[in-house]
């Protein structure tokens, strides 16, 4: 990780869960991390904790609604002005709405598309352009995906969500191919976890907290820190090694 010391990483959805754990890990390794979310209160608290702990890097909170392209473009413009640009882009932000294919609300589907697919695509484009204009040839774009992007589970409330995650799988491989065509050594990686103990299930089942709690009680889940360790592993790979996809489940998880 030495080559990343002092360089700039963008982590979307950095206020809680996987995003917060990844942001903390990168700061621990000396990176300058821009952590964005719709609300930055928790990121500001995390930044203070990192500073108090004496971590060599810094965490810069940035308020951004990833469903709004103008806000994304404004964020990248600010990063360029204040920090020159992005060297690592970690597209972590994602959400699910309990909207089945046969009866779901269009608004919920559109929200998932906007955040899980469009925001990932826009951030990827802008991160690449930031790297290109500064002749950065060793940058990295990491998409935090899901095992739902590799298999469809028999739960109607996550079928549309699964479709958006299949899109992330395709986008990551398409990105890898386009980067090769562009004759650059910028790398693209997809990290696909199974069940991670975060607040994700409580947001999905916001009207049924008992069901959400049962999701995490059924097996010993992955932790957000496991995902952060996977990100560090990917970034630590030698420049000639392209890690395309990491699929990781809790040992006890079946599907």
UniProtKB/Swiss-Prot annotation:
Reactions catalysed: a 3beta-hydroxysteroid + NADP(+) = a 3-oxosteroid + NADPH + H(+); 17beta-estradiol + NAD(+) = estrone + NADH + H(+); 17beta-estradiol + NADP(+) = estrone + NADPH + H(+)
Molecular function GO labels: 17-beta-hydroxysteroid dehydrogenase (NADP+) activity; 3-beta-hydroxysteroid 3-dehydrogenase (NADP+) activity; estradiol 17-beta-dehydrogenase [NAD(P)+] activity; nucleotide binding
Binding site for substrate: 146, 161
Subcellular location per the Swiss-Prot or TrEMBL entry: Secreted
Keyword Acetylation: no
Transmembrane domains' residue ranges: none
PROSITE patterns from the UniProt entry: ADH_SHORT
Residues annotated as the enzyme's active site: 161 (proton acceptor)
Top enzyme class: oxidoreductase
Binding site for NADP(+): 13-18, 38-39, 44, 65-66, 92, 161, 165, 196-199, 203
Activity regulation, per record: Inhibited by flavonoids including apigenin, luteolin, genistein, kaempferol and quercetin and also by carbenoxolone, zearalenone, glycyrrhetinic, curcumin and flufenamic acid.
InterPro entries per UniProt: NAD(P)-bd_dom_sf, Sc_DH/Rdtase_CS, SDR_fam
SUPFAM superfamilies, sorted: NAD(P)-binding Rossmann-fold domains (SSF51735)
Annotated metabolic or biological route of this protein: Steroid biosynthesis; estrogen biosynthesis
Keywords per UniProt: Lipid metabolism, NADP, Nucleotide-binding, Oxidoreductase, Secreted, Signal, Steroid metabolism
Signal peptide annotation: 1-23
GO CC aspect terms: extracellular region
Gene Ontology biological process terms in this record: estrogen biosynthetic process
EC number: 1.1.1.270, 1.1.1.62
Function: Catalyzes the conversion of the 17-keto group of estrone, 4- and 5-androstenes and 5-alpha-androstanes into their 17-beta-hydroxyl metabolites and the conversion of the 3-keto group of 3-, 3,17- and 3,20- diketosteroids into their 3-hydroxyl metabolites. Exhibits reductive 3-beta-hydroxysteroid dehydrogenase activity toward 5-beta-androstanes, 5-beta-pregnanes, 4-pregnenes and bile acids. May also reduce endogenous and exogenous alpha-dicarbonyl compounds and xenobiotic alicyclic ketones.
Family (UniProt): Belongs to the short-chain dehydrogenases/reductases (SDR) family.
Name the record gives this protein: Dehydrogenase/reductase SDR family member 11
Gene it is expressed from: DHRS11
């Amino acid at each position: 990780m030495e080559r990343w010391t002092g360089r700039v990483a963008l982590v979307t959805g950095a206020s809680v869960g996987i995003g917060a754990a990844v942001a903390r890990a990168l700061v621990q390794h000396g990176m300058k991390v821009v952590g964005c979310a719709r609300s930055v209160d928790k990121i500001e608290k995390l930044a203070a904790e990192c500073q108090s702990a004496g971590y060599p890097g810094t965490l810069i909170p940035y308020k951004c609604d990833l469903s709004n392209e103008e806000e994304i473009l404004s964020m990248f413009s600010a990063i360029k002005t204040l920090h020159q640009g992005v060297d690592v882009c970690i597209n972590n932000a994602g959400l699910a709405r309990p909207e089945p294919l046969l009866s779901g609300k269009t608004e919920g589907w559109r929200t998932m598309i906007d955040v899980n697919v469009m925001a990932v695509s826009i951030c990827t484009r802008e991160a690449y352009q930031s790297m290109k204009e500064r002749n950065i040839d060793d940058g990295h774009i990491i998409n935090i995906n899901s095992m739902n992007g590799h298999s469809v589970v028999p739960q109607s409330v996550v079928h549309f969500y699964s479709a958006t995650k299949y899109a992330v799988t395709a986008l990551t491989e398409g990105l890898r191919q386009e980067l090769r065509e562009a004759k650059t050594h910028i790398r693209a990686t997809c990290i696909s976890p199974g069940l991670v103990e975060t607040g994700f299930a409580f947001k999905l089942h916001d009207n049924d907290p008992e069901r959400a709690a049962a999701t995490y009680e059924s097996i010993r889940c992955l932790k957000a820190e496991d995902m952060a360790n996977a990100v560090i592993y990917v970034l630590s790979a030698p420049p000639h090694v392209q890690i395309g996809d990491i699929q990781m489940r809790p040992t006890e998880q079946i599907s």
